[in-house]
Regions:
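N-terminal organellar transit peptides
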Residues: 1-114, 125-262
Length: 262
């Protein structure tokens, strides 16, 4: 039997660095199959960090945000697994990492983006409609019965109350403070102190870099090959799509192709 270490091909293979790649696309929401949620991503993250002895885990992010809770859970999982496995993490922003998308990106050790990437929106929003006049116009009476004076707070079919709005703004302020504390902790020593970064404003990559919100401008393959070598292997881990999802994507692609041909 030939000892494994004496086989030239295997020796070369063993020297090649492996980088795990996880794509995070879409809205951040609980149970979002194919989107971004902690429960859906947990097994994928486990494989990305623990299989194949990776030199790093790269997260390719394209998200406008979503649930603050899911953003926090996903971000904390990234940091926790990185600490447990001692595997560094690098986020690469494609079109956008805004709001919850940036929350997750900032959980990585480093953040890179394209020149045209949109970064930031570090804020919290709640929106809705007031439809009480529409009901009155059509002579519709809505009947609601509750136990607990705040149970129907901000009902869109009732005129809003000042105390309800005050309560909601207080909740939003608390969530905003949690977001701010996360970013300050994750980007400690990197953030600009000359600009208010937490107004919900967005920036392109060049200014985001000046403000310390990202570490550099670059794409994931060139950046990682420069760091780990030209022979670096990329192993992508992704969610398995259901048959209906794959079928739906196929139909959409065929429809687009048909329109383009016409």
């Amino acid at each position: 039997m030939i000892p494994i270490m004496r086989i030239p091909f295997l020796n070369k293979l063993n020297k090649r660095k492996i980088v795990s790649v996880v794509r995070l696309n879409g809205l951040i929401a609980s149970g979002a199959r194919g989107g971004i949620s902690d429960s859906a991503l947990a097994p994928i993250f486990e494989k990305a960090f623990r299989k194949g002895n990776p030199s790093a885990v790269a997260f390719i992010i394209n998200s406008p945000g979503g649930s603050p809770v899911q953003s926090s859970l996903v971000g904390d999982r990234i940091k926790r697994l990185s600490e447990e496995t001692e595997v560094p993490t690098i986020a690469f922003v494609e079109d956008v990492a805004a709001s919850g998308g940036y929350w997750i990106a900032s959980a990585a050790n480093e953040i890179y983006a394209d020149h045209a990437s949109i970064i930031g929106s570090i804020g919290v929003i709640s929106s809705g409609f007031g439809l009480q006049e529409l009901l009155a116009r059509y002579g519709v009476e809505r009947r609601v019965y509750t136990a607990g004076k705040s149970k129907s707070m901000l009902d869109p079919f009732k005129k809003e109350k000042a105390e309800d709005v005050k309560r909601l703004k207080g909740i939003l302020s608390q969530l905003h403070e949690v977001f701010i504390n996360h970013v300050n902790g994750a980007r400690a020593g990197k953030l600009s102190t000359e600009h208010d970064l937490f107004t919900g404003e967005i920036w392109l990559a060049a200014q985001a870099k000046e403000l310390g919100l990202i570490d550099g401008i670059g794409h994931f393959v060139p950046v990682l090959k420069e760091r780990f070598g030209e022979k670096t292997r990329f192993k992508e881990y992704s969610q398995k799509k259901s048959l209906s999802q794959r079928f739906g994507v196929s139909i959409a692609k065929d429809a687009i192709s048909l329109v383009e041909e016409k």
